Design a protein with these regions (language model features):
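Accessory "access/gating" subregions that flank catalytic or transport cores
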Residues: 29, 37-102, 112-115
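Short, mixed-charge, low-aromatic patches
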Residues: 14-19, 42-47, 68-71, 148-159
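Ubiquitous "structural anchor" signal
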Residues: 31, 69, 137-139
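A broad, structural surface signal
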Residues: 3, 17-25, 60-64, 88, ...
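Terminal amphipathic helices with adjacent charged low-complexity linkers/tails
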Residues: 1-44
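Thiamine diphosphate
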Residues: 60, 81-161
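Short, charge-rich amphipathic segments
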Residues: 17-23, 45-48, 74-76, 127-139
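Electropositive phosphate-/nucleotide-binding environments in soluble metabolic enzymes
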Residues: 10-21, 52, 56, 80, ...
Length: 161
């Protein structure tokens, strides 16, 4: 606060510092939740470990499944958080026959996956909450046609769209 406001407006710096301390103290002392959770540091034996995010692991699993089933993997998607990393990770596996398509909207994304399923590929599309809602009509088409297709719904951490 002093670095930002201290020289020109010491009164603003002091007011902001007091507000910060009051908020901190309130958060530490208010019993707003029934339980407190604390995650202790993991005790790992020495060795080599790989740090993998969930979307990255999902992408690796999809590539493996396509490879084991002797199918080309097609992923048509419109970038939307938090599903975007799946598209980004799958685009790194062109040498495994993975085809990715960044569509102009959610409807085009699912329709591209429907086309890939018609063509015999392991077809996927993915999105998050509002994107899944936009795909609804085309999902109905895929179901009526009984096309094998995977639809990924990556959940957001909160209620926001």
């Amino acid at each position: 606060m002093n670095d930002k406001f201290g020289k020109k407006r010491p009164d603003v710096a002091e007011a902001n510092t007091l507000a910060l301390k009051a908020g901190w103290n309130y958060g530490e002392t208010a019993e707003l939740f029934e339980r407190n959770y604390q995650v202790q540091p993991a005790h790992l034996t020495p060795g080599t470990y790989t740090n993998v995010m969930g979307n990255q692991a999902l992408a690796w699993g999809l590539v493996t499944a396509a490879n084991l089933s002797n199918k080309e993997l097609f992923y048509g998607s419109y970038p939307i958080t938090p599903a975007s990393p799946v598209l980004e990770e799958l685009s790194n596996f062109k040498n495994y026959g993975v085809k990715t398509f960044q569509a102009e909207d959610e409807i085009a994304a699912i329709c591209s996956a429907i086309g890939a399923a018609f063509g015999g590929s392991m077809a996927l599309t993915g999105s998050s909450g509002p994107g899944i809602a936009l795909k609804g009509e085309a999902m109905g088409l895929a179901m009526i046609l009984e096309l094998p297709m995977l639809i990924l719904k990556v959940q957001r951490g909160g209620p926001s769209t």
